[in-house]
């Protein structure tokens, strides 16, 4: 079923929590760590950080390495930092919160392993705008990210978030490998309070 919307751009501006100059950066780290059986093995993690620059994201990456002792068994680790195209990332109480700050940021994370299905999902949404002058439909797509317990739960969370304020179709939901999300304190508080509402 396709829904019609007269003004997607104003809706997205009101529902996108992106501050000017801030972006989500994906930090991929590879290091030698302890496996569950006690042996040393190559470990890989991915985190998302909401930062003002690549340099700030790099500082967070090094703070994560030091804080989680990822350099405990070897000084040889790899860091890859990529600016993402994520524009909207929702908060959910599925995320646990670290007591302390990491490089001045609030660290939220998933307590369950990805095998359970709990994690971050990118949900592709199609919006249909109706040109009032000629009556033609124009389709645009956006991927909205949300913590969820499954593909179906992610889709439902996006439907609830968008509500009746705009017409849309949820197309697809894909699991994202990010294990944690780091936000400035004010952004975290805003997201947590809007989730509670």
Segments predicted by a language model, with ranges:
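Short, positively charged and aromatic/hydrophobic N-terminal segments
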Residues: 2-14
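Short, low-complexity cationic-aromatic patches
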Residues: 18-25, 50-56, 112-122, 137, ...
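A cross-kingdom feature marking solvent-exposed beta-strand/loop segments within repeated
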Residues: 33-50, 58-59, 67-71, 135-144, ...
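Short amphipathic, charge-patterned alpha-helical segments
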Residues: 58-65, 155-158
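Mixed-charge, glycine-accented linear interaction segment located at domain edges/termini
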Residues: 135-174
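Beta-strand elements of well-folded, non-transmembrane domains
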Residues: 29-35, 50-53, 125-131, 148-150
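Intrinsic disorder/low-complexity detector
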Residues: 15-27, 70-127, 168-197
């Amino acid at each position: 079923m396709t829904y019609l919307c007269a003004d997607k751009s104003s809706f997205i501006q009101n529902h996108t929590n992106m501050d000017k100059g801030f972006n989500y950066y994906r930090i991929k780290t590879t290091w030698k760590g302890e496996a569950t059986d006690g042996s040393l093995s190559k470990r890989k993690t991915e985190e998302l950080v909401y930062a003002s620059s690549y340099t700030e994201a790099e500082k967070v990456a090094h703070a994560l390495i030091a804080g989680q002792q990822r350099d405990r068994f070897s000084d040889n680790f790899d860091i890859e930092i990529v600016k993402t195209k994520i524009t909207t990332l929702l908060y959910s109480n599925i995320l646990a919160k670290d007591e302390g700050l990491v490089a001045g940021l609030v660290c939220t994370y998933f307590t369950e392993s990805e095998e359970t299905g709990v994690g971050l999902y990118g949900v592709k949404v199609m919006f249909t705008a109706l040109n009032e002058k000629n009556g033609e439909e124009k389709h645009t797509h956006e991927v909205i990210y949300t913590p969820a317990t499954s593909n179906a739960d992610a889709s439902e969370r996006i439907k609830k978030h968008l509500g009746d304020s705009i017409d849309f179709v949820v197309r697809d939901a894909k699991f994202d490998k990010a294990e944690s999300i780091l936000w400035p304190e004010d952004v975290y508080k805003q997201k947590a309070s809007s989730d509670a509402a």
